[in-house]
Structures are given as structure tokens and as C-alpha cells.
Amino acid sequence: AQKFDGIIIEPTKSANFNPNINYYLNIESLGIPYIMINAYYEELGPTSVLLDDEKGGFLQTEHLIKLGHRNILGFFKTDDMQGTKRLKGYLKAHRFYGVPINQNNIITYSTEEKLTKPAEILENILDQSVDSLTAIVCYNDELAMSLIDVLRNKNIAIPDDISIVGFDDSFLAEISEVKLTTIKHPKIKLGEKAAEKIIDL
């Protein structure tokens, strides 16, 4: 069997207990170093390279608050550590600026629900009260693009009627007809840092 010198892993569902923990314990018993990037499984306590997702969620929300928004819907994928931390940043920004938090404005979803639940919830909210909602914080750009489609189908102008902020600064933000405000994700820098760290292990 081929022996690896090291493995860089991006965990999925990192906010949940990992049922495949034995795979990682086997890697450890073989003496193969590994690093987790973007998130980590807490029970393993591995070496990891992370983005400050809490600060990212704070910056997304702060941007909208500074533009005068007070009724900000937040969509967070909470089976990933990144989502729980971005939600924490969203809450922190509201507290910091003294903006009341409406519990109904916090929408959480799982990886399996990402293609359906957020869009359906936004449609329902818009059908009930289009006037009060003025801004949306999105877990990532992929979600932002999906929600932009919902808004356009309802003839809601962005950012005139509703402002929307993404996360990742992905190619989706670049190709979108709507100029999407998004938090930059230093993907290359993160990868370089992980490579440097694994060489040192």
C-alpha cells in the first residue's frame, strides 16, 4: 500500500460528531500527519488552518447595519463549523451596534437542505411581509445567487429594495449580473499555509 507523506483534509459537517472518526485514528496510527483546512472535528483536536469565520459573519452584518438596515435576515448552514461561527458573528454585530435581534430572522439549514429550504423560506417570508425585510446575510455566494433568483422572480430589485451580502468572493460573484457584495476568502493563502504546516509536521 502507498504511504502518504501527509494529508490535507477539508471536513464536511464539521459542527457535528464525525461517525468516521476511525478513519482519522487509523491515519494517526499509521504515523501519517494530517491537517484540516477551513474547519476541524473538535473531538480529534487536529492541527488546522482556519479562516476567522466569526469575524466574517460580523463584517457581513456590520456592512448592512452601517448602510442603515435593521431588519436583516441571516441564512446559515449550521452542520458546518463555518456556519455556526458566521451566525455568531451575525449576532455579535447586532449586539455591538445595539440592533435588536429578531429570532425569526435567523434561518438555519443543513447540507442536504441547501438547494431547497433557504429559497422556500425566503419565498414564504416575501409572501407574508415584503416591506419589513430590507437585507439578507448569506452563508456563501452560492446561496446568495440562489436567493437572488427568488428575489428577481418576485420583481424585487437588488440593492434598491433588498440588499444581499455573500461570503467567499467566488467566481459566482464575478459572473453575476447583480453586483454582489461578498466577503473575500483567501483560498490560496489558506492552502499555502496548510502546505507549509504539513511540511513541518
Which role does the model predict for each range below?
Residues A1-I8, K13-L201:
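Bacterial carbohydrate/catabolite-sensing allosteric modules
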